[in-house]
Structure formats: C-alpha cells, structure tokens
A protein has these predicted regions:
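Post-transcriptional modification and biogenesis factors for structured RNAs
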Residues: 1-175
C-alpha cells in the first residue's frame, strides 16, 4: 500500500536510486512529475530492480494531485517546513494507499502539493540541515515499510513485472 512520488528531479542518478529503493521496500509504483530519463541513464543506479516498479509520469504537479484525489491516495511530503512534524514520532495510517513525496533537489516540494499533503521532516542532530532527496526517500520508505511490517498483513513478496525488461512508463495528463 505504498508508492513514491518524485518531483522534477534534476539528477538522473537520484531517480535511479529511488527506483532501487522503491523495489527493495516493496513500493508498488513511482510517480514522476516532470522528466523521466531514458532507461540507460538510470539503469546503473537502479540496478536490475528497474523492472519491479511501475513508473507513472505526470507533466505537472496538478495532474498528479488530480490522480491522487481520484485514487484516494494519502499524500505525505518530506519537506523542511514550519508546518512539518517529525517523522520519528509519526504513525502512518495504512487505511488508504500511502504516497510518499520527495521534491526537487533545490526547490523541494511545490506549494500546491504541500497544501494537499501531510508534511513530515527528518530530525537531524548533526551539523547538516538536509539530506540528498534520494536519501530522504530511503528513510521515509524504511520507516513506512517498518511500520507496515509491524501489521499482520505484511507480505514481502515483490510483484513481478510482466513486461520483462521494459521500463514501464505511463504518461497521464489531466484525467
């Protein structure tokens, strides 16, 4: 019951790492708002796991939000924001499909998605104030998967992509 959403990533490897993490933690799909690089540009970072995650592309944040509303996704954004609550004390609700959102490496999560999302941040006691966006996604995925695993319904079997070696990309524009 977990998906990821990457917003306008600038660095192809970050998207590749996100695909790898999504597959490792059992995320069903990766929504990408903006550009999806060619398979060859992200396959090194994603490894052989690129075939286990469905990638759904949206041109604009509003298109993703329309889809999220239609699918009744519980959107949770990772962002440093005054409205954000710490991930460490958050309990995810799995009554609805959970979609974890990470933003652009420089500009973060767009305001329109922030307005529609629950906002969380990662407490960091060290000298840095923010992590690489793919690292942030890893921590959010780990915590969501850990909490879900604590439920009796956890099933660690990964879905098999029936499309073989193809990168699965679906573009959706204003549904």
């Amino acid at each position: 019951p977990i998906s990821l959403c990457a917003i306008n990533f600038r660095v192809d490897d970050n998207l590749g790492y996100l695909i790898r993490s999504a597959a490792c933690f059992g995320a069903e799909r990766l929504y990408v708002v903006g550009h999806v690089p060619e398979r060859r540009r992200i396959s090194a970072a994603s490894g052989t796991l690129i075939d286990y995650v469905e990638i759904v592309q949206f041109s604009h944040p509003r298109d993703f939000l329309e889809h999220a509303k239609k699918e009744d996704l519980h959107v949770v954004a990772a962002e440093l924001d005054e409205r954000a609550r710490p991930l460490s004390s958050h309990h995810f609700n799995f009554d609805r499909h959970l979609c974890l959102v990470v933003g652009n490496e420089e500009s973060g999560v767009p305001p329109e998605i922030m307005a529609a999302a629950e906002i969380l941040y990662i407490k960091m006691p060290g000298v840095g104030f923010c992590l690489n966006t793919s690292h942030t996604a890893n921590i959010f995925l780990y915590e969501a998967a850990r909490q879900y695993e604590d439920l009796e319904s956890y099933n660690p079997i990964l879905p098999v992509n029936s499309r073989g070696a193809q990168l699965v990309i679906k573009e959706r524009k204003g549904e």
